[in-house]
Every structure is written in C-alpha cells, then in structure tokens.
C-alpha cells in the first residue's frame, strides 16, 4: 500500500482549527462503510488501489483539511465508476454537516463552545429521529429572550430537553441530565479554580477546614491513598443519571457551601461515601473503597437516605429508622420529643412506642 510515509509525516487540520496526525485508516473505514451501506462487494486489492490514489493526490495538498480529504474521496470513487457509492458518500457527508450545523448553532446561542462536544456525544448515543437536536434547537429558541445570561440560556436548553420528554420519547430525560451535568461541572470547575484547588486531596482539605467534611476521613487516609482514590473516579458514569435523579442529587445530597453552592460532584459524593464505609477495613482497604464506589456509581445498589446525605460529613448518622419507647412521665415524654427532633434533623425516620404511657383517666 502506498502513502505509508505520508501517513507518518502529514498532519490534517480539523474543522475546529486544530492540527492532528493524519490517519489513513479513517479514510479506509469511511469508504468501507459507504460500500457496505450500498450492499456493494469490493475486493481488498481494489480498496487498496482507491486508497493509494486518494493518498497520492493528497500528498501535494498543503495544508491538508478534512474537506479536502472528503472531496478527493468523492472524486476518486466517481473516476473508478462507483457512482452509487459516491452518491451515498455525498449524502452521508451532507447529513454529517447538518448535524454539525445544529450543534454549532446551539452552542453559539448558549455562548459555550465546550457544549459542542456534549452535543456530539448526544448525537452519537441517541440516533433515533425522535431525539434529533433540531427539535431541541426549536424548543430551546422558543425559551430564549433578549438579555439572558449564559447561565440562563444553559438552563433554558436543559428545560427544553425536559419538556421534550414524553412516553414516546423517554430518553430526552437522559439528554436533559447530560446538559444539566455539563452546566454544573463548568460552574463547579470555576468554583474550585477560584479557590486555587486542583486535586481531590486539596478539595477534601478545604471542605474539612470549612467544617463541611468530617475530619475523620483525612485522619484515616493518607495523602497518597486519597490520590489513589481520585484515580477511581469515572465522570462518564454521570451519564447513567436521569434529569430528575441528577437534579435531586445536586439539590439535596452533594456537599454545598454555607451559601448553598454545590462544591462536590456526584462521583465525588459516591467516592466520599465509599471512603467512609471502608475506613475501618483491616485489609485491602483501598480495594474496598473501589468496590463500594463502583457499586454506587454504577447504580448497582442504593444507599439509605441518611447514608447518602451524611456519610463523609461531620455529623455522620447513617441509619434510616429508629424506635423510641416513650416513658410514662412528663419528663420522659418531652425527652422523647427532643430525641425525635435530633434524629429527624440528620435524616433518620422515627417511630414512637406509647405502650408505656397510661391512658387518659387511668389511676395515678
């Protein structure tokens, strides 16, 4: 096969302006898909010859761009008489261009260039027509008003995805969750950047110093163990959330500042719970941290509300249900009410047994 040297030396300029090493395998795969899509058989020798022609013609092109490569593939296919395949390739190229345009329009309207990659992943994972981003764009634009801030536009985009969720198109709730998560992670990164903190240990130290994190976590784990635990984090597992689930977590369960600003990501929350649950393990403690984290972050198990809320925090009441026997005295009754309030404060459910209290009118 010709073009091997060019593949090593050449670079290609992508649509975002970045230059990356040129990979001829991508051309081969794209042409193979075009032939397969038309049900056309083509021998490996002829495919190699087509690829060699494309590469030889591209070797004189500086700078090399994605559009130039695609133009050359189309021309070579038609020169060799593969008109139906070339037509399918052109239509596929136009479809991809339309997908890019809607992504670009949404990202530009919001004012967030990093949103483009999130939208690209959505297009890859939700290919049914009912989840077309064109529908999201139309709904989003109906919510936009002059003078909206970037955060307000991002919120409107998420709201648009939520409103598109129906019984016939339930996966819009997962799309809405991805949009919400992107907005949250951007704000969260800015919060920590403003505080000059760049790693998990630094974040835990900051939260501990502010009284938001239990000091027992850093007392049980070394700096190196926290760094090891940080490697366990899998941000892509945020994609398992529905919008309602993620929204609830961000509002009620992740650690927040005194001014109600979330300072913990959902994955850091799961890891913090795992660190708490495994801290007294005698052997292979970090292995248990990873096991607990994986079970939680993959949604394989669900912890009780107090565990989700309080593990890793200063007041770590982890149990769900309590029963208190109310004594037959005024002091005892009010002491039970005091216990009820304290348990409820930290998320515990409370039951009260009044069997010891005499009925009204009984003999004293």
Where are each of the predicted segments found?
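Extended catalytic cores of very large enzyme megasubunits
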Residues: 1-364
């Amino acid at each position: 096969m010709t073009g091997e040297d060019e593949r090593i030396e050449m670079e290609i300029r992508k649509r975002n302006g970045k230059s990356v090493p040129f990979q001829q395998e991508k051309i081969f795969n794209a042409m193979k898909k075009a032939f397969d899509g038309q049900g056309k058989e083509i021998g490996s020798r002829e495919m190699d010859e087509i690829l060699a022609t494309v590469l030889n013609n591209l070797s004189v092109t500086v700078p090399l761009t994605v559009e130039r490569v695609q133009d050359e593939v189309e021309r070579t296919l038609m020169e060799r008489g593969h008109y139906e395949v070339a037509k399918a390739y052109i239509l596929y190229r136009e479809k991809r261009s339309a997908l890019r345009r809607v992504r670009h329009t949404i990202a530009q309207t919001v004012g967030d260039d990093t949103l483009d990659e999130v939208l690209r992943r959505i297009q890859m994972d939700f290919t049914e027509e009912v989840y077309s981003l064109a529908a999201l764009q139309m709904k989003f634009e109906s919510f936009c008003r002059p003078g909206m801030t970037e955060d307000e536009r991002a919120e409107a985009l998420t709201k648009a995805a939520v409103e598109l969720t129906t019984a016939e198109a339930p996966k819009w709730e997962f799309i809405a969750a991805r949009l919400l998560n992107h907005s949250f992670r951007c704000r969260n990164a800015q919060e920590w950047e403003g505080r000059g903190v760049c790693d998990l240990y630094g974040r835990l130290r900051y939260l501990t110093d502010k009284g938001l994190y239990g000091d027992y976590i850093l007392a049980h784990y070394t700096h190196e163990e926290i760094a090891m635990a940080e490697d366990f984090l899998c941000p892509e597992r945020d994609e398992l959330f529905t919008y309602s689930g993620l929204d609830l977590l961000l509002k009620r369960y992740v650690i927040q500042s005194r001014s109600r600003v979330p300072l913990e990501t959902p994955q850091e929350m799961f890891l913090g719970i795992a660190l708490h649950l495994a801290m007294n393990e005698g052997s292979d403690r970090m292995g248990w941290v990873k096991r607990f984290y994986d079970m939680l972050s993959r949604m394989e198990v669900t912890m009780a509300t107090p565990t989700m809320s309080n593990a890793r925090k200063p007041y770590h009441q982890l149990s769900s249900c309590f029963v208190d026997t109310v004594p037959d005295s005024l002091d005892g009754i009010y002491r039970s009410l005091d216990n009820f309030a304290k348990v409820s404060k930290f998320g515990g459910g409370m039951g009260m047994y009044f069997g010891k209290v005499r009925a009204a009118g009984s003999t004293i």
